[in-house]
């Protein structure tokens, strides 16, 4: 995406970030989303999850790494993604041995997790984050996020 500025028409260049593909490349999906958003090049995003650098698993969003999923939802919400017609795709597939009648549960689960994480982002205390940054108390910030995700007061 960065090299798109050197093309004849940079406005025609954009990307579709898929969480699992970023993970497969050893990257953090939230950082990749943030980079694309900063360049105004995120055309769509496909959220899913991945257990390390195996084959492309297309697991339900957030089932392997809840914190990583939270960070993705947070960066999308902070940047108003979706307010101008953009959409979030759920690029997931049913597990190989899933019964036909359960073949949509992975989509339902992904959507439930996404909405639950949106609610967590809405509760995020940015003033506390700023205080932690100013005091360089990143352990407190890390624990705050974990407590938020776990529902611990």
Q: What do the PLM-derived regions correspond to, one by one?
A:
Residues 1-153:
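Histidine-acidic metal/acid-base catalytic patches
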